[in-house]
Amino acid sequence: MSELFTTHNFDVVCHFAAQAGVRYSVEAPEVYVHTNVLGTQTLLEVMQQNNVTRMVFASTSSAYGTTTQVPFKETSAADQPVSVYAATKRSAELLAYTYYKQYGIQTTCLRFFTVYGPWSRPDMAMLKFAQAITAGQPIDIYNHGDLRRDFTYIDDIVEGFVQAVHTPLGYEIINIGNGHPVKLLEFVELLEAQLGRPADRNLLPMQQGDVYETYADTTKAKELLGFTAKTDLADGMQVFVDWYQQYYQSQQTI
């Protein structure tokens, strides 16, 4: 990494690198600490050594942990994470603040809310559910479906990130979300309708490390970045389903 920074000039670092996902962090916490905490500190240290003074960091709504204030505001407490993943991403935010105070590295931490869309990670609910429903296999629904998620389409996430890249702000934490949480069972019903198949629902208790609700207050994103999510869940899911049927199902016929 040092060689990269000494041979190239960077105006802004876009920091997406991470070990992602709540559930795997229960099984392999050391991987999350090494990647998300030590990796971020290493990056910040190389930045300050090479006079790179701006970063936009992909953080997560999981940082809010057990907060009961909804919608989630950036001023809400974020000191009770319920997963190692959340703790490591929050730690990275705090490291960025320290480097801002010590070295003047400006960082905008964007807390993403339940990102979905084409080319999603294999462990994300929409893709896992689509694959299982198509194959006639059961889907695991935690807390018996009594969960709410602020699903945010990938194109909206990208738009918010690009706006942050072009907007120096010192040090800020900003929610990037849709602002309209949906019950998990409603999400499943919509996916069933768009796939044209019913799901075999396996209703389970709350999963370790999970939270009941995510719900973004997007006021700050509007004020500082001029950002508002444009894609509702039905429209975004339809784009996902079209992609899934074209890409995944076509692979099965080869």
Residue ranges and their predicted role:
Residues M1-V115, D155, T231, W243-S250:
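N-terminal Rossmann-like NAD(P)+-binding domain of SDR-like oxidoreductases, especially those catalyzing
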Residues S91, L95-Y99, F129, F187, ...:
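Hydrophobic alpha-helix immediately C-terminal to the catalytic Tyr-X-X-X-Lys motif of short-chain
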Residues R90, I105-T108, V115-K128, A135-P138, ...:
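Glycine/proline-rich active-site loop of Rossmann-fold NAD(P)-dependent oxidoreductases
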Residues I154, Q207-T228, D232, V239:
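Conserved C-terminal active-site "lid" loop/helix of NAD(P)H-dependent oxidoreductases
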Residues I157, F161, I176, F187, ...:
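Non-catalytic, hydrophobic alpha-helical segments
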Residues I133, F161-V165, V188-L191, M237-Y244:
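Hydrophobic "lid"/C-terminal helical patch
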Residues A17-A18, A58, A92, G160, ...:
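Small-residue (primarily alanine) positions within well-ordered alpha-helices
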